[in-house]
Curated annotation (Swiss-Prot):
Region described as E3 ubiquitin-protein ligase catalytic domain: spans on this chain: 492-788
Protein family according to the UniProt entry: Belongs to the LRR-containing bacterial E3 ligase family.
Organism: Salmonella typhimurium (strain LT2 / SGSC1412 / ATCC 700720)
Record PTM: Ubiquitinated in the presence of host E1 ubiquitin-activating enzyme UBA1, E2 ubiquitin-conjugating enzyme UBE2D2 and ubiquitin.
Enzyme class: transferase
Protein name, UniProt field: E3 ubiquitin-protein ligase SspH2
Annotated LRR repeat ranges: 223-242, 243-264, 265-282, 283-302, 303-324, 325-342, 343-364, 365-382, 383-404, 405-422, 423-445, 446-466
Primary gene name: sspH2
Amino acid sequence: MPFHIGSGCLPATISNRRIYRIAWSDTPPEMSSWEKMKEFFCSTHQTEALECIWTICHPPAGTTREDVINRFELLRTLAYAGWEESIHSGQHGENYFCILDEDSQEILSVTLDDAGNYTVNCQGYSETHRLTLDTAQGEEGTGHAEGASGTFRTSFLPATTAPQTPAEYDAVWSAWRRAAPAEESRGRAAVVQKMRACLNNGNAVLNVGESGLTTLPDCLPAHITTLVIPDNNLTSLPALPPELRTLEVSGNQLTSLPVLPPGLLELSIFSNPLTHLPALPSGLCKLWIFGNQLTSLPVLPPGLQELSVSDNQLASLPALPSELCKLWAYNNQLTSLPMLPSGLQELSVSDNQLASLPTLPSELYKLWAYNNRLTSLPALPSGLKELIVSGNRLTSLPVLPSELKELMVSGNRLTSLPMLPSGLLSLSVYRNQLTRLPESLIHLSSETTVNLEGNPLSERTLQALREITSAPGYSGPIIRFDMAGASAPRETRALHLAAADWLVPAREGEPAPADRWHMFGQEDNADAFSLFLDRLSETENFIKDAGFKAQISSWLAQLAEDEALRANTFAMATEATSSCEDRVTFFLHQMKNVQLVHNAEKGQYDNDLAALVATGREMFRLGKLEQIAREKVRTLALVDEIEVWLAYQNKLKKSLGLTSVTSEMRFFDVSGVTVTDLQDAELQVKAAEKSEFREWILQWGPLHRVLERKAPERVNALREKQISDYEETYRMLSDTELRPSGLVGNTDAERTIGARAMESAKKTFLDGLRPLVEEMLGSYLNVQWRRN
């Protein structure tokens, strides 16, 4: 009986019904062989195994010796443990492959010879296929002469034909997997499994993220419509499947893209060094290409609705399609914008070099254009709800739309405000030149927050605000402002001169302590820290606390010895001097807190665990006080947040043992914090410490650093277990929740279960850490508050 030889092409998947139809149609010999070997495979693998047997017996166009090896290796992979030893390649030489029964009798074999013959022997029947030498694409040879080089391929179809069967796909994928560098082999194996599942299940979504890949195989499943490739190391992509509708590639190393499928609807390429784009499909609706290195864009498709080109190097934009609804182009080098489509609803062009904006469409409801060079704004659409134009050069604003909900105009040159819409919920005019305010401000809702900090408001205006907001029944907005108004600009001294005023003079013959601060003056934010030191000398602590100067001198001595701590402290100084002296004091507290944590992480308390726990307790108490202060701020109508935070810290310094806090502040009387508030806060902090501190310190980063140094083996074992717990939980959630719901490959769903898996693994890690913490810290955790 001759072999049942057809076209050599089978569908991408074969149902059980199709298997039996093939098996009972004149029973070709490979099916007789199948009856003898199907028990080698579990029921879930039998379909794929039969597909592979069929392909071995009917080699498709382009078959190479490597393909034959891959097909027999695939059968070994699919077989039950133990039965894979019955599937051989190279038993009688490198060109002989066979499958044996339980008595070691041959069921099926394939032999290749140097003449280019591919011979299949199966149950007494033999069929030879003629192979050709692939010397050039599309060229066929008639044999393999001795000494010739090249690859034998079957000669039925051109060698460039794409895979048609799962076995053909698997051959290509397996070869790609075996060619992996050592560090990439695990990732490629995982991706091959995903592609097999995608092909066998008919899943239209393929996600191959975070696998450490530098390449992809030459062929991807042809049927997929969504391809997601986040966080690998790809420098290029293979030819894309023709039916693709959505392509998302983030966090790779792509500098260019292949030809895009004509039916592509959504293209998202972000966080790559991409320098240019190919021609875009005419039906493209969504183009997100932010975080690349693009300097220009191609012609945009007429039906494009969303365009995100933020974080590139664009100096201009092409003509915008009439259907465009959303345009995000922040952080580029744009100096102007083209005409905006009439239906545009969202426009984000912040962090550019725009000196003006074009006419705004009537449908626009969101406009973000902060950090540009705008000196004026065009007329605003009546339906605009968000206007974010901070960090420009505006001296005035146009009439504000009645629907406006959010207005951010900080860091401009405004001297006055127009009438404010009654429905406004957020107003930030931080750092402008306002001396007075519109009457409409006090008529805003009680749900509205207003930030007036950094403006030179007149004393008359401040007094009026105090009277209005403190009146019985006041139901207007919450207003934040500077108690002493904005500080006037002042000259910044050289850092070593500012430091010298605080440092102890040198003894005779010794170098001046301030000398080494000469070189620190070249570091980032040194000017800000110099100004901060000068402002410290104007605070209540300098005036009233005789030991304050010595404290600062000691602090500066540590900063001089620690580059990392100095860099963090200098950076914090940039926000410390923008208003009143209490702000300077508050930021000093923040800097001292950073110092405490830094010392713990560096190992200062490795041999003084009591001091480590004491530092942790102080951080816990300060954190609780901050929560209490934030709640208090919400109850005040006219408030300087700094004064509220500082009031709790300053007045509870002694009762809560806050070593990083100073003893004086200037504006406590107008902070809004009462004696009752302070008493309640003290009780709340102490109660919270008693019930929560053991769990809190278990999660404290500096404690982890100490444990890693003192018990590295135990901590490392717990870290490794945390990683394996995460992977196991993620797989379980994927199998039990995503797969049944058809959400495998859905980025949002996978991110959600990833967060749950991470949280579960973290809890297990902390549970494992608890005995070590109890063992090492012991009684230090049992310290109780003394009765007053």
